[in-house]
Amino acid sequence: MRWDSLTDDANTADSPDEAADADGPDATATADGTGATRATGPAALFGAGAVTTRTIDTPEFRGITFHEVRARSLVNRVPGASRMPFEWTVNPYRGCSHACVYCFARRTHAYLDLDTGLGFDSQIVVKTNAPELLRRELAAPRWTGAHIAMGTNVDCYQRAEGRYRLMPGIIEALRERANPFSILTKGTMILRDLDLLTEAAGVTEVSTAFSIGTLDEDA
């Protein structure tokens, strides 16, 4: 999957290779007064207003660039050859500020023409329409209510979630449809949504799992 498949109005580029660095010599950008820029020219793979690149100069987000996109789809089917114990996943973000050096998902950033090292840690793609898109996909006649796994590629409760708050809407959409789901995280921010998770568990199967990075209490 490349940058163009992340947006719902990509119509200005001839090829995925035009997803070049927005700071390139042929690119221009306009600021909107909020620390955001919108790429135009050859960098504008997504069409007018389809992607916003944003940096936020606060301690918790320093060094991180957010690429806000409107995704075309959210529920992903796991390839049949996979040995994963689930068939469907949801990832509202791409890239992860947890910066785990062992993360197997790093190579997926290459599909977006982004760096798989530091870029994976600091260039975060945010699917800003994730909750509304999930509601639409769960309501589709072809959807059978299968289990959805989250946190399989990147952590849904990484630092970006503190700003964008996509997970409450996602959990609510799953609860409304009584659709079973699971979450894998190492982020304590999941506690913010404990009430929502409890409500969802009252109507469907909900499971959470936690990745423990160290047993050293002083680390």
What are these regions (language model features)?
Residues D57-R94, V101-A209, T214-D218:
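Conserved Radical SAM active-site core
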Residues M1-T89:
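Flexible, acidic/Gly-rich N-terminal and inter-domain linker regions that tether
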